[in-house]
Amino acid sequence: VDAVNANSNIKMDFPTDGEIEYTEYPNPYLGSRNRKIIGQKYNDEKLLKANFKNDVPFERFNDGKKSVPVLYIEPENDTVPVSYPLYMGGDFGNTVIKTHRDSLPNVLIYGASFTNAIETVAYISCNEMHSVDMRHYGDMSLLDYVKKNKPDVVVGVFDWSNISDLNDDGKF
């Protein structure tokens, strides 16, 4: 949000410290390391959930179908290990969140599972937030998606292990 505000004529808002509170899940958290350390010792890192003082109602669509408007899939209990699927319910090729606030920009976030955590807080600054997971989306190229949906802001989110891979994430 700060980078968009500093480098463009588009102005985005994000809740200040008094308007957002983070809750820490007590569960063991694998996070983005899941694919590399499955079954190995957990560290002390904890998953955080953003709670906005003034929640914004929204509609959610996953892969073109209207979905339940949730941001977090709560774990069964405090001891079950949690990972990135807790954010946004996991990976979808395309998620669209509509807040119906025309004064805010339409934003496209593309990348891989790292987008899931960002989506849970980014939507509040958007009229529409589109998220494309390049590993699972194949309906059209990223360029065609941008031409069709005309977002005001486009943000790419990748981890260093995938950005130079010419398959999946790197092919776009």
Features from the language model and the residues they span:
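Extracellular glycan-modifying ectodomains
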Residues: 1-172
